[in-house]
């Protein structure tokens, strides 16, 4: 009897344990009683739809992630047959999708379609559409720090020093933004535009896109003869969604754009955005995006994708603008403080942010493409990389990325006799400990087109004696670093660390830019 009772108790425990395990499993996977499950193992929420008709709920009680667009989902299919059969099933049920991207086999559905045929019957897998926005204005920087930045106060064309290469003729540039307003700067520009955000291409809130477009192809822009394909994906408040961004990317690619500018972002990676970026990459489109103005140590998407050229902002003297996000995957640094651009009602305004910096790169690429017609898109990007000015820590760094765009070097690249040695940077790590001895790295760069055989670098720390270094052979674009060790002032000290340096070639009279041979900086610990 005891054995029978023990057996029954053991059996009951097994059944109870199995029930508990099933309940926990369903809760962890996000399952409801109707067979809809969610999976977050890939870093984003993926919806698994039921594959049997009787498992489909009449209504879906779905918990939408933060920043997801409520009341709608994105359904992905792996083949065109299933994709078309699902669309046909919706029509037969008297339903319709909110949107679809045929090239990506993606359907956007709302609440009404959620009560229709299960996408799982057709092999569909779901995800969410997320809020996308233009980079926020750089307001998080303390006013006293922001005041230290030096605004350009000039148009893009003046900043780059006139024509870079070609005028953009024959190049089609796509702009995904808040639309574009009529402005005298665009009187001679051929513009095709569509509105995916529903506010009208030139409706309220189009000022951001207008400023971006004027840097690229306005009469005061870098490539004034380029043609524009403007896709409005942001509303009058600068907000949009990742479905419209993906749709805009695909439409721009299908229209044949050469370069695509995206001064917008979202911090949620999605399958939909990845597929759209891959689609553009497969069609050899150069993509450029703003790194963002939030001061984070990560970048938003699409700038964070390796296929996209990400751009941070610098001020008039080449300093990082304090507000941009930081990442070692940043590709270029370009002007982004107080750039004079077009605005509504035919006027002009000072435009700041990585949203301003990105179109400098886009416009420059359009200019080069219109002149270097035999170069591939990859070769044109590599050409820009080879003429960047070193800044920040040696090599690629999270603040300046690979370097600052230098338009003079772009123009001079085919003149083989230019001598230009530059004092590129005096670098002390931001995490230098007050009161300790730390290395200061002094970076010299050959910004000319001829080889440097010998130069002399002189470094002065505080009131100390000058220290000389001999710089050997440097090829065009190459850099070299010398270190000096010094005491960093303590945290409670009012002293600052002053360092000055100068580099002189053995033929100083042949140096075309003596103004970049010297640099002086001071470091002061931040008082708590």
Regions found by a protein language model. Give the residues of each.
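C-terminal subdomain of the subtilisin-like protease fold in secreted/lumenal serine endopeptidases
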Residues: 30-50, 54, 62, 253, ...
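Catalytic-core environment of secreted peptidases
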Residues: 182, 191, 203, 313-355
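Protease zymogen maturation seam
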Residues: 6-11, 21-22, 51-67, 93-102, ...
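Extracellular/luminal regions of secreted and cell-surface proteins that mediate adhesion/ECM remodeling
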Residues: 407-528
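Mature extracellular/periplasmic domains of secretome proteins
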Residues: 162-168, 239-261, 270-287, 296-312, ...
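Hydrolase catalytic cores
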Residues: 213-216, 233-234, 258, 322, ...
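Active-site glycine-centered loops adjacent to acidic/histidine catalytic or metal-binding residues
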Residues: 177, 292, 353
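Subtilisin-like serine protease catalytic core
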Residues: 162-173, 179-192, 200-243, 305-307, ...
């Amino acid at each position: 009897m005891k054995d029978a009772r023990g057996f029954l108790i053991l059996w009951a425990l097994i059944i109870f344990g199995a029930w508990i395990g099933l309940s926990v499993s369903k809760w962890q996977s996000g399952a409801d009683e109707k067979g809809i499950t969610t999976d977050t193992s890939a870093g984003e929420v993926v919806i698994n739809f039921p594959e049997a008709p009787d498992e489909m709920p009449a209504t879906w009680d779905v918990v939408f992630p933060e920043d997801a667009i409520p009341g709608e989902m994105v359904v992905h299919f792996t083949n065109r047959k299933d994709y078309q059969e699902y669309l046909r099933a919706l029509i037969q049920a008297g339903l319709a999708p909110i949107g679809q991207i045929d090239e990506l086999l993606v359907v956007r559905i709302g609440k009404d379609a959620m009560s229709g045929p299960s996408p799982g019957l057709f092999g569909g897998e779901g995800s969410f559409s997320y809020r996308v926005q233009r980079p926020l204005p750089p307001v998080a920087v303390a006013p006293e720090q922001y005041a230290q930045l030096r605004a350009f106060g000039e148009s893009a064309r003046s900043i780059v020093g006139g024509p870079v290469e070609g005028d953009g003729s024959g190049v089609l540039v796509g702009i995904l933004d808040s639309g574009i307003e009529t402005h005298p700067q665009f009187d001679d520009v051929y513009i095709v535009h569509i509105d995916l955000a529903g506010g009208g291409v030139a409706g309220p809130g189009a000022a951001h896109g207008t400023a971006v477009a004027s840097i690229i192809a306005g009469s005061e822009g870098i490539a004034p003869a380029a043609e524009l394909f403007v896709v409005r994906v942001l509303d009058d408040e600068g907000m949009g969604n990742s479905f419209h961004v993906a749709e805009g990317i695909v439409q721009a690619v299908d229209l044949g754009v050469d370069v695509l500018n995206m001064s917008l972002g979202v911090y949620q990676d999605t399958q939909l955005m990845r597929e759209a970026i891959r689609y553009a990459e497969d069609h050899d489109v150069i993509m450029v995006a703003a790194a963002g103005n939030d001061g984070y140590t990560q970048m938003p998407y699409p700038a964070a994708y390796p296929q996209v050229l990400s751009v941070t902002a610098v001020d008039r003297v080449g300093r990082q603008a304090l507000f941009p996000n930081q990442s070692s995957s940043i590709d270029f640094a370009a002007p982004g403080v107080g750039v004079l651009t077009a605005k509504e009602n035919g006027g002009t305004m000072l435009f700041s942010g990585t949203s301003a910096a990105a179109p400098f790169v886009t416009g420059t690429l359009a200019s080069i493409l219109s002149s270097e017609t035999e170069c591939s898109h990859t070769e044109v990007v590599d050409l820009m990389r080879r003429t960047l000015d070193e800044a920040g820590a040696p090599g690629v760094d999270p603040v300046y990325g690979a370097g600052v765009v230098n338009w003079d070097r772009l123009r001079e690249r085919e003149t083989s006799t230019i001598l230009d040695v530059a004092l590129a940077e005096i670098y002390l790590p931001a995490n230098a400990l007050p009161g300790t001895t730390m290395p200061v790295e002094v970076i010299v760069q050959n910004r000319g087109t001829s080889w440097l055989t010998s130069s002399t670098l002189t470094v002065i720390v505080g009131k100390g004696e000058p220290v000389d270094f001999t710089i050997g052979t440097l090829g065009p674009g190459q850099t070299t670093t010398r270190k000096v060790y010094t005491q960093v002032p303590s945290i409670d000290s009012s002293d600052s660390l002053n360092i000055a340096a100068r580099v002189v070639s053995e033929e100083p009279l042949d140096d075309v830019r003596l103004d970049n041979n010297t640099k002086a900086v001071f470091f002061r610990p931040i008082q708590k």
